[in-house]
A protein has these predicted regions:
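HIT superfamily nucleotide-processing domains
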Residues: 1-99
Length: 99
């Protein structure tokens, strides 16, 4: 399911051009438009999930494996020495896009 009003759905599904670094049937990984650090990337599921409580366990596990794959690639290519893996859930936790 996609949400036509969700900016991340539009980015993940190609409705808006992106700096994509990886894509498969379930996810698109893009470089952040305003990166906080070198290699700042967003792992976007192609299906709409407002928060971690809506995503099924299988897709969540795939996202974790993909995060490791992307971080390993960035370590090798960009020389990144450390990583932040962030997933904000809820407005009080800093979530601004509910995807």
């Amino acid at each position: 399911m996609k949400d036509d009003n969700c900016i991340f759905c539009k980015l993940a599904n190609g409705d808006i051009p992106t700096n994509s670094i990886y894509e498969d049937d379930d996810f698109k990984v893009i470089l952040d438009a305003s990166p906080a650090t070198k290699g700042h990337a967003l792992i976007l599921p192609k299906q709409h999930y407002a928060n971690i409580f809506e995503i099924d366990d299988e897709t969540l596990a795939k996202a974790a494996k993909l995060a490791k794959k992307i971080m390993t690639h960035e370590k090798d290519v960009l020389g990144c020495e450390g990583y932040n893996l962030v997933q904000n859930n809820g407005e009080v936790a800093g979530q601004t896009v509910f995807h």
